[in-house]
Structures are given as structure tokens and as C-alpha cells.
Design a protein with these regions (language model features):
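Charged, amphipathic alpha-helical oligomerization/scaffolding segments
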Residues: 112, 119, 126, 176-178, ...
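Alpha-helical initiation/capping and key positions within long helical/coiled-coil segments
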Residues: 112, 306, 310-313, 450-453
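Extended, charged coiled-coil "arm/hinge" scaffolds of SMC/Rad50-like chromosome-maintenance ATPases
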Residues: 270-301, 308, 315
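ATPase nucleotide-binding head domains, primarily ABC-like/P-loop NTPase cores
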Residues: 351-576
């Protein structure tokens, strides 16, 4: 029976998404952070690719957030699940029963296929037991539990387990076979055949004489061909030099060659004797226990539609959650604060697709990497809503403007990926995409010049973004004169207000922040949107950076004189 794939990442495989560009992931520092989660490049790339897919559907975010919480809190469950799924993956990749079924297969192949099928059932059983024994609450894992139960029921595993058990009881009686060889007057094999299939193993006897001892002593020669049910035997290596020239070996060789000439049993080649002996006896055993072979084939035909389902696709998905859980647990043990994001639920009378309430947030890079700011992480609060749509962020050089701008982008990437966010709380409406307009590398601006490249890139971003996107701008249009940069920047903010997307624009152009009221009035008159722009500042404590942000009018200076004095580069300090 065909089973639809189950996913721990996508409750609805038809949900729409937008993929963040590599540039955006780099601007937010997420590419470097993902490299910290695993030493394997393949796993790093998979995790980054998952995070780059932004699903605006709140149901996807909630689904992931709940699953991650279960994974984070249930260490034993996540370890057990990975072990079970890897066993299933091994069966799927290297097993034989999932390949084309051969009706002419011998008893040994048939039993091997049954064993693999039995192993798969055990894995499904273990998967269900693991989920049933874990304290899970997410719809994703509860759904997986139901999915496993459905696989079990739909494929008739309970009946199959019974059939396999009964077959095992029958086939377990096959312990050995007895071969008879007729000799002519020259002690050459005149015929070879199978006498019986036995329910006992032959056991090694004491040291016996060689072939001449047997024929020299009449009391060791049976008077008839009736087998006395003696299970003692003397094993010999058919390829060993010591026995290669013995009469018994010659008898065996002659018998095999004669049988071969009659289209019967082929001669045993050099190599793995156990495997060759099995192949040597396949046809004879199949004939003598034809009823048992028929029974095994009937069971396999009954369940021929069973295939290892695509549960193995859950392995990288589970790995995604596990790698993040392990890393965040490590950071939590070091004292960093993380919290589960909450998807904004619209009220009965109104909804706010622009809503974001972030409390005590910080840039994840400060926890992951050892930087100048890492030793003094300052948590911040920030809100977006239907009214507060654009922030013009100003403050001193190296005051933390870029750090907080990155942090907001990271919040959405992490939360919509289901991962705990760095901070105390985060309630939000998911974005359709994130766009960054950060300074470009010099080698990318040679053709158009830096300002030309910035303008072209902003136009492309603006055309692709929509009202539910997040736009993060870092010192945009500041590479030219103040007058030119200000003119372009102001028109850009006006256009952003027109579209209504959530935006943080950090800049040294304090005049742009002073003009927010003028731009807001213009937009209100045009009735383009009900969103407004606000001035936000990064506080300074004298010449010391506080990294604390606040919605407030710009302070109108960049603290250049204080910084110059701190580093001794004022005119007076330089020429004294």
C-alpha cells in the first residue's frame, strides 16, 4: 500500500515559501552560525537550506516550534529515534526484500528476505514504542505516532509477524543434509545424491583414520546402504593442500565433475566455502523441502506490496532539530537565555500581519562567537505593529546599530524555522521573506560604482518584496555625499512606507530621522498605508557605548568628537 510521505518540517507540503538569498543569510550571520552546528558540510548545508525557506503560513511555524520543544526536552527520545531511523535507512539502502522479487529464488534467499522484513517490522515496533513512551505534545510527533500505527495496520504487520514466527519454527529444523556417494571398482565416484535433510547438526568426531584406514578395516564398512543416523563426522577443507590429493578428495572431485557433466551440481571453486556449499546444495534442498519453499513463497507473495516507506526522509529533518537542540542546550548551560517563539494569533475582530513583540533579545553571534561585544551583551526590546512599521535607527559609530539590525533578522529566521530565539520572549506574525541591503563588497561595485550598485540592488529588492516582508538596511546610500545620499534615502523610506513592509534602516544620516513626521504626514494624506516611520536611537553613556535602543528623536550628533578624544586624534592632541 502506498503511503504519503510524512514530514516533521512541513505539515502541508503545498504551503508556499520564499527562499532567502545567500547574501541575506550571510548579512545576518546565519551561514557562519549554521557551520557551528555540525562538523559535516553536508549537514551544515541542509540546515542552512531549511532555514532559508521562509514559510509565511503561521501553521508551519507553530508546527515546527512545538516539535523543536519536544526534541529539546526529550533527549532520550531524539537519540532513540535517530538510532531506529538509521536502522531503517540501512535496510532500505542495502536490503534485498525491497528489490524486485524473484520467483525462482532458493530457500536461503527467501529466508533472508523474510529476516529483513522481520527486522523492518521490529524497527516500526520500536519507533512506535519510543513515541508512546515519550512525553510528547507537538502535533508533529503525535502525528508521526499515528502515521507509524497506520503503517503497521495497513500492511498487516500483526499477521505477518505470526506468519514469520511459524515459518521460523519450521525452517529452524533445517540443520544439516546427508549426501551419499557411490564408488566404482577404481574408487571413483559413480554417483552422488542427497540422502536426507536433517533436524540435527553433525558434530565433529575424534581423529579418524584416512580413507585407506576405512577400507582396510572391514568392521568399518557398512554391509548395506541404510544410514544408521550417526551424526558424528570428520570435517575437511576441500581446498587445503593436505587433503587435495587424498583419495577422498579425488572421489569428491570426480563425483562433482560427473554431476556437472550431467547438468547437475557445479564444482566448488576456490574461495568462500560456506557460500559455495550453500549454492551447491540449493537445488537439492529446494527439491526435498518443496512444501516448505512453497510456504515461504506464499508468505512473501502475500506481503509483496510491502516496501520500506519513506520514513527515512525523516532522518535529515530530525537531524535538523537535534543539531539545533544540542547547540542551544550548550549555550543555555553557559548562561545564555533562549525562549520559544509564539506565533501571533489574531483576535476575533482584528488581525495584525505586522505584529512583533521582542523582549530581551540579542544577536546570536554574540553568544556563538567571541567578539568585543560578547562580554557585555545588552538585551533589548522592540515592537512592530500596524502603526509602527519603519524604524530609522541612528547612533554613534560602533554603537551596536548593525548588531541589533542583524538580531531582528535572526529572530524571524530562527522562529520560522521552529528554533528557540535568543531572548526572553518573541511574539510575531511570520514574514513572507527577509531582504537585506548591506554594504556590498568592493569587487561587486566596479562596474556601477558603489552608489550605483546600491541603487540598483535596492530597486530589485523593492520590486520583489511585499507588505509582509522584512527589510533590513545597513548604512544604505552613505557612500556618496550627504546631500546625494539623503535625497535617495528619503525617497526610499517614502516608498517603503507606501508598500508598508516592516523595516529597520540604520544610518548616520540623523536628518533622515528628524524628517519622519514629515514623511508620515505625506503618507497619511495619500492614504497609502496606516503604517508610520519612527526614530530609534542607540544610547551612549558619555563616550561609552550602552548598546541600548529606544524609540526617541535623534540626538543629532555622531559623537565623533568624543571618540576622537578617546583615541587621541583631535587636532590639539595630535600636534601638541
Amino acid at each position: 500500500m502506498s503511503q504519503q510521505k510524512y514530514s516533521l518540517l512541513y505539515p502541508d507540503t503545498n504551503a508556499q515559501y520564499r527562499t532567502l538569498s545567500d547574501v541575506t543569510m550571510h548579512d545576518l550571520g546565519m551561514d557562519l552560525i549554521c557551520k557551528k552546528l555540525s562538523a559535516k558540510e553536508r549537514e551544515q548545508n541542509y540546515i542552512q537550506n531549511v532555514m532559508a525557506r521562509m514559510y509565511a503560513d503561521p501553521a508551519v511555524t507553530q508546527y515546527r516550534c512545538d516539535i523543536f520543544e519536544d526534541v529539546l526536552q526529550q533527549k532520550k527520545m531524539r537519540d532513540d529515534l535517530m538510532e531506529i531511523l538509521e536502522r531503517i535507512s540501512f535496510l532500505r539502502e542495502y536490503g534485498s526484500f525491497n528489490r524486485e522479487y524473484d520467483e525462482s529464488a532458493c530457500i536461503w534467499d527467501l529466508l533472508h528476505r523474510l529476516d529483513e522484513l522481520n527486522d523492518y517490522i521490529k524497527c516500526v515496533d520500536a519507533l512506535h514504542t519510543c513515541l508512546a513512551a515519550s512525553d510528547i505534545h507537538s502535533a508533529g510527533f503525535l502525528g508521526l505516532k499515528a502515521y507509524v500505527e497506520k503503517i503497521y495496520a495497513d500492511n498487516g504487520f500483526a499477521e505477518l509477524k505470526k506468519d514469520i514466527s511459524e515459518l521460523k519454527m519450521d525452517t529452524s529444523q533445517l540443520k544439516s543434509i546427508t549426501v551419499g556417494i557411490n564408488l566404482n571398482d577404481r574408487f571413483e565416484a559413480d554417483g552422488i545424491g542427497l540422502i536426507s535433510v536433517n533436524s540435527k547438526y553433525f558434530t565433529k568426531s575424534g581423529i579418524l583414520g584416512n580413507f585407506y584406514d576405512h577400507i582396510a578395516s572391514k568392521d568399518r564398512i557398512n554391509e548395506d546402504t541404510i544410514w544408521k543416523k550417526n551424526f558424528k563426522f570428520q570435517p575437511f577443507d576441500v581446498n587445503a593442500d593436505a587433503v587435495s590429493n587424498t583419495p577422498m578428495q579425488k572421489v569428491m572431485d570426480t563425483a562433482i565433475m560427473r554431476s556437472e557433466s550431467r547438468g547437475g551440481i557445479v564444482k566448488l571453486p576456490e574461495g568462500d566455502q560456506a557460500k559455495d556449499m550453500t549454492r551447491y546444495t540449493d537445488r537439492i534442498v529446494n527439491h526435498m523441502i518443496s512444501h516448505m519453499v512453497k510456504r515461504v513463497r506464499e508468505v512473501l507473495n502475500k506481503y509483496v506490496s510491502i516496501t520500506i516507506t519513506d520514513m527515512t526522509d525523516l532522518i535529515p529533518e530530525l537531524l535538523y532539530y537535534i543539531k539545533w537542540a544540542e547547540y542551544i542546550q550548550k549555550l543555555q548551560e553557559q548562561g545564555f537565555t533562549f525562549a520559544k517563539a509564539s506565533v501571533y494569533k489574531a483576535g476575533e475582530n482584528e488581525s495584525d500581519p505586522y505584529m512583533m513583540q521582542a523582549r530581551g533579545i540579542y544577536n546570536l553571534k554574540l553568544a556563538v562567537f567571541d567578539t568585543e561585544e560578547s562580554g557585555n551583551i545588552v538585551p533589548n526590546d522592540m515592537d512592530f505593529d500596524r502603526n509602527r512599521r519603519v524604524y530609522i535607527l541612528t547612533g554613534a559609530n560602533r554603537g551596536g546599530k548593525t548588531t541589533i539590525t542583524q538580531a531582528v533578522g535572526q529572530l524571524f529566521v530562527l522562529a520560522q524555522g521552529g528554533i528557540y530565539i535568543p531572548g526572553k520572549a518573541f511574539t510575531f506574525s511570520p514574514v513572507t521573506g527577509i531582504f537585506t541591503h548591506f554594504p556590498a563588497d568592493e569587487d561587486k561595485t566596479l562596474d556601477l560604482g558603489r552608489l550605483g550598485e546600491e541603487c540598483k540592488r535596492f530597486k530589485a529588492i523593492y520590486e520583489e518584496a511585499d507588505s509582509r516582508s522584512l527589510l533590513l538596511m545597513n548604512e544604505s546610500f552613505s557612500t556618496t555625499s550627504f546631500e546625494e545620499g539623503y535625497y535617495i534615502a528619503k525617497d526610499s523610506v517614502r516608498a517603503i512606507l507606501h508598500k508598508g513592509m516592516r523595516t529597520i534602516y540604520n544610518t548616520h544620516m540623523h536628518k533622515l530621522a528628524f524628517d519622519v513626521e514629515e514623511m508620515n504626514e505625506e503618507q497619511q494624506k495619500a492614504e497609502h498605508t496606516d503604517g508610520k516611520a519612527f526614530s530609534m536611537i542607540v544610547h551612549m553613556k558619555g563616550t561609552e557605548r550602552s548598546y541600548q535602543i529606544e524609540v526617541a528623536p535623534p540626538e543629532g550628533k555622531s559623537y565623533a568628537s568624543e571618540i576622537a578624544q578617546k583615541y587621541g586624534v583631535t587636532y590639539e592632541m595630535l600636534v601638541k
